[in-house]
Amino acid sequence: ALYKALLQDDSLREDARGYVQKYMLEKVAAEKHASTVKMEAVPGFYRIYSSVFLKIMRTSDLWESEQRSGKDCFDVTIKRCLWHTACAENGCPELCRLFCDADNVTYGGLRKIGFSRTKTLGYGADCCDFHFFRK
């Protein structure tokens, strides 16, 4: 809604994506990262985090995904994504990339969990291929 409002204002239209990007990365993702860093102090964090993440992906109808897990890693391949669907349905598919970029900030640089991804729906791929591993 904010993005669409910014697009309606001639003086803000050109910078609308930049404003939303700055907010998503410097506020939303940075706060999610900071809270995850705090949670890392909990003993057994990796086991708890992986269990909760996988349960959410298995039980939520907001995503369509496949999950694989091992002792020290877990993978989630997302074929349908809440953010990708919402952005497309609201006429701003270009915003989905900001959610993908926010994941990089949220999960990047953690001490106990590593994160990688080679493709995302938001950047035009057929899926998002999340890979998390114990550090």
Where are these regions (language model features)?
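A short catalytic or substrate-binding loop motif that flags glycine-/basic-rich loops and adjacent residues
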Residues: 57, 123-124
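C-terminal edge-of-domain segments
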Residues: 124-134
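Amphipathic interaction/junction segments at domain boundaries or subunit interfaces
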Residues: 1-90
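Short, intrinsically disordered/low-complexity patches at protein termini
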Residues: 37-40, 99-100, 131-132
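Short, hydrophobic/π-rich interface segment
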Residues: 65-122
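Secondary-structure boundary elements
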Residues: 8-10, 108-114, 135
